[in-house]
């Protein structure tokens, strides 16, 4: 998960999905280009999405020809919960 979060482009993708969940690859690429002037190819963004999916930070599902991507904050929540629980046990 930390490796997935280390890349600034992947963090921007997560920001976009947090702002507007359920986007296609085309929508994500368009928004990244407009908002951040990011010149990454669709293939590069697709690879970034696969890393985020592998880390459990993004989920996707197909509807016909379209594949929609959704942010999943569960892994981050479990991590912060673990740190909080450890902190309360120590106090």
Each predicted region: which residue ranges?
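N-terminal helix-turn-helix DNA-binding core of bacterial DNA-binding proteins
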Residues: 3-4, 8-41, 66-77
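Hydrophobic alpha-helical segments
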Residues: 24, 62, 84-88
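Short alpha-helix boundary/capping motifs
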Residues: 29-30, 41, 56-57, 80-81, ...
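Short, hydrophobic-biased segments on the C-terminal half of alpha helices
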Residues: 49-50
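Beta-hairpin "wing" of winged helix-turn-helix
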Residues: 53-63, 70
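Hydrophobic transmembrane alpha-helix bundles
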Residues: 61-67, 79-83
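Phospho-regulated, low-complexity intrinsically disordered regions of nuclear gene-regulatory
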Residues: 73-91
